[in-house]
């Protein structure tokens, strides 16, 4: 990687990191019903980083988790944000091998849905670990874990994916 590419990579990583930290702090459109939270656009920087590089995605995910922590979200939501490391890393490595996925609407939809499932499973698992460690009776949490967090995450993830894809494609055309 030449110096110009390295500089561009670092600059993009820094910009996406700043966005990932700021969104949980300043986004006015959010619904928080712990352990569920829906902040419009909260995954956009992660997805754009994922479209570009696994290492960029990992760094932006860690920064996003810090953003949720700094914004004062409950720790279970911060843990959910950190669980993005699974879908972000898997997605980034997949796209490295299959970059054409983003340009084919059918492949992109399937990729988005599978990513949403991985995303939801990781978030539900993070919640289960958190609540099991606090002594909470998980039997009474089916609705919260599988409807609010699980299904809600799939929908939220898929919406943010398409927002990120639109931004990514627009920027790619201009560059």
Annotated model-derived regions:
Residues 1-175:
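Loop-helix junctions at membrane interfaces
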């Amino acid at each position: 990687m030449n110096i110009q590419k390295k500089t561009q990579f670092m600059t993009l990583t820094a910009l996406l990191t700043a966005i990932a930290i700021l969104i949980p702090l300043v986004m006015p459109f959010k619904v928080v019903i712990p352990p569920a939270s829906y902040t419009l656009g909260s995954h956009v920087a992660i997805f754009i980083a994922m479209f570009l590089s696994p290492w960029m995605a990992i760094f932006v995910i860690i920064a996003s988790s810090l953003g949720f922590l700094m914004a004062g979200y409950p720790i279970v939501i911060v843990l959910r944000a950190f669980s993005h490391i699974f879908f972000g890393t898997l997605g980034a490595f997949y796209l490295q091998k299959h970059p054409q996925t983003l340009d084919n609407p059918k492949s992109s939809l399937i990729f988005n849905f599978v990513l949403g499932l991985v995303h939801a499973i990781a978030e539900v698992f993070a919640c289960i670990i958190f609540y099991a460690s606090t002594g909470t009776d998980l039997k009474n949490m089916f609705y919260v874990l599988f409807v609010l967090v699980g299904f809600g995450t799939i929908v939220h993830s898929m919406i943010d994916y398409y927002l990120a894809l639109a931004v990514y494609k627009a920027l790619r055309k201009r560059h």
